[in-house]
């Protein structure tokens, strides 16, 4: 179904790849783009489970908008984690980030369509936990992810 604000639909493949990431943990990340006709969000790239964060950031073009989801694994060390993990005091956690990538070099029309489709697309991805917006590589680093998980 098309987004009421932008008229952009979401392909079934987008939903399927997201579910594989969320429920099956089959992928580390999925990058999405709006097709050239500006009618539908489609899958642009899927990162294998062993992919690093740098592979996600390398998948985001310097002159084009994208959406992405990233399954970020990290550990916590606090009283709850200590009780759950035993002596080590660290417990594994995972958060799914939704990234809206809109670099300064992208054309204005593309930025407008991505911005107006953003909320509708996120609603199709049930299970996203943290929302990030980035316009520059410095806004999308492991330190930024860490800040959102601590």
Swiss-Prot record:
Domain ADF-H residues, every copy: 7-150
Keywords: Actin-binding, Stress response
GO molecular function, one term: actin filament binding
Pfam families in UniProt: Cofilin_ADF (PF00241)
Biological-process GO terms, alphabetical: actin filament depolymerization
Xref: InterPro entries: ADF-H, ADF-H/Gelsolin-like_dom_sf, ADF/Cofilin
Inducing factors: By drought stress (at protein level).
One GO CC annotation: actin cytoskeleton
PROSITE patterns in alphabetical order: ADF_H
Ribonucleoprotein as UniProt keyword: no
Function: Actin-depolymerizing protein. Severs actin filaments (F-actin) and binds to actin monomers.
PANTHER family assigned to the protein according to its UniProt record, in alphabetical order: COFILIN-RELATED
Record family assignment: Belongs to the actin-binding proteins ADF family.
Name of this protein: Actin-depolymerizing factor 3
Species, as recorded: Oryza sativa subsp. japonica (Rice)
Gene designation: ADF3
């Amino acid at each position: 179904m098309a987004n009421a604000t932008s008229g952009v639909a979401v392909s079934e493949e987008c939903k399927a790849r997201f579910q594989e990431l969320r429920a099956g943990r089959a992928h580390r990340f999925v990058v999405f783009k709006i097709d050239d006709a500006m009618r539908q969000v489609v899958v642009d790239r899927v990162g294998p489970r062993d992919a690093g964060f740098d592979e996600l950031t390398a998948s985001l073009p310097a002159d084009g908008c994208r959406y992405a989801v990233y399954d970020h694994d990290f550990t916590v060390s606090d009283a709850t984690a200590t009780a759950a993990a035993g002596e080590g005091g660290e417990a594994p956690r995972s958060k799914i980030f939704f990234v809206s990538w809109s670099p300064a070099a992208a054309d204005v029309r593309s930025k407008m369509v991505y911005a107006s489709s953003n909320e509708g697309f996120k609603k199709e991805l049930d299970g996203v936990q943290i929302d990030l917006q980035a316009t520059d590589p410095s806004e999308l680093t492991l330190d930024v992810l860490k800040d959102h998980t601590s």
